[in-house]
Amino acid sequence: INDYLTFIVLLFGLFCVSGNITLSGDLAGSPRINVGLLALGTLLSSWIGTTGASMLMIRPIIKMNAWRKRRRHIVIFFIFMVSNMGGCLTPIGDPPLLMGFMRGVPFFWSLKLLPILIFNMIILLFIFYHFDMKAYRKDIAAGLKPDISKPGTEVKIRGSHNLIFIIMIVIAVILSG
């Protein structure tokens, strides 16, 4: 039961902390922006957990693409990349790696998977970009436009003080091994 309790406490802590961080801005959901956010979310998954990264990144992605009619593929690729594949680099990102860490596997052992993760990210982001560009062009041709008053690149982070708690959780997990 100790293993499961550790897992639940970590998951709950990252869920609560990352759920109180909000990213917002006036970015429109274009293929380039979506690729950037998927890449960022995938890399974040190993450091704040797949649940934490999913909580943090899904709201801005949904909001930025709300104006689009063709957007199902965005959530599908989000689940593949951020909610699953991205957690492979540290025990914080993936429950089986956490169990291994609790049984003596070094914390940074799985970092050797970084080249494989990057390779898979490039392939999936390339495929995603082509799906998204095709859907984006159809939406624009249908007369749909982003729902922002003044396009720009301003991104706001609310609840940034919670980043300190995320760092504390990560350090606590590393020190517990």
Region roles according to the model:
Residues 32-86, 99:
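Hydrophobic transmembrane alpha-helices that form the pore/transport pathway of multi-pass ion
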